[in-house]
Amino acid sequence: LLKLRDAIGELIGVNFDPSHMMWMGGNPLTAIRQLEGAIYHVHAKDTRIDREHSDPNGLLETKVNERFRERAWNYVTLGYGHGDIWWRDFIALLAQTGYNGVLSIEHEDLSMSPLEGVRKSVDFLNQIMVREIPNQP
């Protein structure tokens, strides 16, 4: 993406979804730093790694999502994979690197209904979001 941006400019940017990097073993926070200024949209989506299944088999998962109890990783409701400290760091880093857009909740947690998952995600974000930023000199 960055090479493409070098070639054509800021016409193109990233729809950043941290959950994919999580299950691949990457670090979304490092990626945010590398993509500074190129993040145009952000998904608020979490992933839980189940070490009982991932340690002996790795993270490359071939079981269908509906077999979530047997999988090495699953998409989960916000806060059910990574806690509030991680998500605070994520949101703060997005702001520090110039992102001031929305966080779009993407619910794919099969352990609860979509309505409950979205409600829990909204409640979670409401608890950790910074609402008032002081004026900077």
Show the residue positions of the predicted features:
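Acidic/histidine-rich catalytic cores of soluble enzymes
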Residues: 1-80, 136
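Substrate-binding clefts and catalytic carboxylate motifs of secreted carbohydrate-active enzymes
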Residues: 92, 97, 113, 117, ...
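Residues at the N-termini of beta-strands
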Residues: 41, 101-102
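A structural motif corresponding to the C-terminal end of an alpha-helix
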Residues: 8, 89-100, 131-132
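A short, acidic, flexible beta-alpha connecting loop/helix-capping segment that sits on the rim
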Residues: 104-114
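A general structural detector for well-ordered alpha-helical segments in enzyme core domains, enriched
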Residues: 1-4, 31, 86-93, 120-125
